[in-house]
Amino acid sequence: MLRILLDTNVYISAILFKGKPRQILQELVDERVTAFTSNEILKELEETLSKPKFKLTNDFVQIVLTEIRDITKLISTSPLKNYLDLRDRNDYHILEAAFSAKIDYLITGDKDLLSLKKISEFKIVSPEEFLRIKEEE
């Protein structure tokens, strides 16, 4: 079974909109992939979903977080030894989780992360690319 990690932006898109990210979230629910997350990702997700612009209740946000905890494996992360050339240093926690979980795919909509080509341990793909890969299996 494929081992994946979803970036926070994929969770946000899956929760708020229909489309490819929601299809990937369904893959997690249906246990067709093994998904990992970290406390840092969950914290970022909670902070983002709690922003007034999304108009979501705290109860809804907590239910979402509980569901994500139920369909993912929580991992502890280690700091990156070799700092990669990332423009947004706030993305480091995503890479730390990806390396710690020993995943096959990091799924993200973040252009900075998608532009990283130096990583040989796992592939960084968009939701669309991941679903295409999954179809070809």
Question: Model-flagged regions — what are they?
Answer:
Residues 1-19:
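Metal-dependent nucleic-acid phosphoesterase active-site entry motif
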Residues 6, 18, 22-52:
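PIN/NYN-family metal-dependent endoribonuclease catalytic core
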Residues 7-8, 37-38, 109-110, 126-127:
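A secondary-structure boundary/capping signal
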Residues 19, 36, 59, 63, ...:
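Residues at secondary-structure transition points
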Residues 70-105:
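Active-site neighborhoods of divalent-metal-dependent phosphate/nucleic-acid chemistry enzymes
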Residues 84, 101, 111-137:
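Acidic, PIN/NYN-like endoribonuclease modules and their adjacent C-terminal/linker elements
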